From Swiss-Prot:
It is found in: Cell inner membrane. It comes from Rickettsia felis (strain ATCC VR-1525 / URRWXCal2) (Rickettsia azadi). The chain crosses the membrane at residues 6-26, 41-61, 79-99, 104-124, 142-162, 166-186, 230-250, 274-294, 297-317, 323-343, 361-381, 384-404. This is Putative transporter AmpG 3. GO terms for molecular function: transmembrane transporter activity. One of its GO terms (cellular component) is plasma membrane.
């Protein structure tokens, strides 16, 4: 039991990650909305989160470059984690001295730095939670704890931030966020450095452009030598995300069209929904540990189809608080359940010394898929009624099933992948 205490550390680091993520995507935009800033300005502030989509660019550097003294003293992963945490704390401290409503440009710059530091921490945490576990059961637990921590952080950064701002003001909200972030370096010092499955070749010399591309090339090749495998996996991930990404992107427009109040959306969808997502994520991790990757991914994908179906039912019935609660429950449970499982699947594909780079490549494609699906969904929703739109969403999402079996029949099966862990 003592050996698995690192899972608590992963949970706490996930919490910090979720808190800083929501700081950019929810807390600051909400404060600016209260100050009556226009949506275009609020939207432009959100561009500060761009590093989250571009982690793959500097993940090879994190895999290859060893920070003098820190990496030799604390280990490669912990050394990088300490650096990202220290700079994150400095950026959060600087943010305390800035009023977002009065200093938009400085706010955007500091948020960009926070985003860069937080996404760097995410790269290291992704690699840590893949390398540290010693069995596939522990791998599932590591991703489950990380998922729970991230969503708890999101809960603190949204509902918790709103209540604190009402009682104490926004400055106290950011002080609270800084206080939580300070826990990060302490956690990193308390957990052990993981032992990589393959020997890690690092350097203290800044890697050149040729070496940089060599790391990316080797990372992609080591995912799988057969190109067809990679293409099928990419198509599978794209279709798998459709049942979650489209309903999530279209949820607010649908709820407002059906005349649900802001209070109902905040309490039921934001607060209650996040708690249900945590439960779903935990159960998804347990299922993956018990049944393995192959069956878990299939079950998660099928259950996820209930999400757009419930949105279709809600859109057909109209305003009904009971159906609304059921829809939110189903959608968030499915998002947490399938989200944890697909993350574990991503981790199972990473099997070389370039774990951080490999996971960043896969996760970046997943994020890109979510953005594309949300954008396409918005265009389609403009020309269709809500019930027809979500019925189409359900049918489109079902296409992942034949792709899944296409992969299995070509011996690109998830069972063999899970045995590599």
């Amino acid at each position: 039991m003592y050996k698995k205490l690192y899972l608590i550390g992963i949970l706490l680091l996930g919490l910090i990650s979720g808190l800083t993520f929501n700081l950019i995507f929810f807390t600051v935009p909400y404060q600016l909305s209260e100050a009556k800033y226009t949506t275009d300005i609020i939207g432009s502030i959100s561009l500060a989160a761009f590093p989250y989509c571009l982690k793959v660019i500097w993940s090879p550097f994190i895999d290859k470059y060893s920070i003098p003294f820190l990496c030799s003293k604390f280990g490669h992963r912990r050394g990088w984690a300490l650096v990202s945490q220290i700079f994150l704390i400095l950026a959060m401290t600087g943010f305390l001295n800035v009023s977002p409503c009065n200093n938009l440009y400085i706010t955007a710059i500091i948020l960009f730095i926070i985003s860069f530091c937080s996404s760097t921490q995410d790269i290291v945490l992704d690699a840590y939670r893949i390398e540290r576990p010693t069995s596939k059961e522990e791998l599932s637990m590591a991703f489950t704890f990380s998922s729970i921590g991230f969503r708890l952080g999101m809960l603190l950064g949204s509902v918790g931030a709103l209540y604190l701002s009402i009682i104490f003001g926004w400055n106290t909200v950011y002080k609270f966020a800084l206080f939580i972030t300070v826990v990060g370096p302490i956690v990193i010092l308390c957990i052990k450095e993981p032992k990589p499955k393959e020997k890690r070749h690092t350097t203290t010399n800044l890697i050149g452009l040729q070496q940089y591309f060599e790391v990316i090339k080797k990372s992609i090749i080591s995912l799988k030598n057969e190109q067809q495998y990679l293409l099928l996996i990419m198509l599978f991930v794209f279709l798998y995300k459709a049942a979650d990404s489209i309903p999530m992107a279209m949820s607010s427009p649908l709820f407002l069209d059906l005349s649900f109040t802001t209070h109902e959306i905040a309490v039921i969808y934001k607060a209650y929904g996040l708690l249900i997502m945590i439960v779903g994520g935990a159960l998804g991790g347990v299922l993956a540990a018990k049944m393995g990757i192959f069956h878990s991914v299939l079950i998660g994908g099928v259950i996820q189809l209930l999400s757009p179906l419930m949105f279709m039912i809600l859109a057909t019935i109209g305003y009904d608080i009971r159906i609304f609660i059921i829809t939110v429950t189903v959608q968030n449970f499915c998002a947490g359940f399938a989200g944890t499982i697909i993350s574990i699947y991503f981790a199972s594909l990473c099997n070389s010394e370039f774990v951080a780079t490999q996971y960043s490549i896969i996760a970046s494609f997943s994020s890109l898929s979510r953005i594309i699906l949300a954008s396409l969904g918005g265009i389609c929703a403009k020309y269709l009624t809500w019930p027809v739109f979500f019925l189409g969403n359900t049918l489109f999402s079902m296409l992942f099933i034949p792709i899944f079996y296409k992969i299995y029949r070509k011996k690109l099966d998830f069972v063999n992948i899970s045995k590599k862990i």
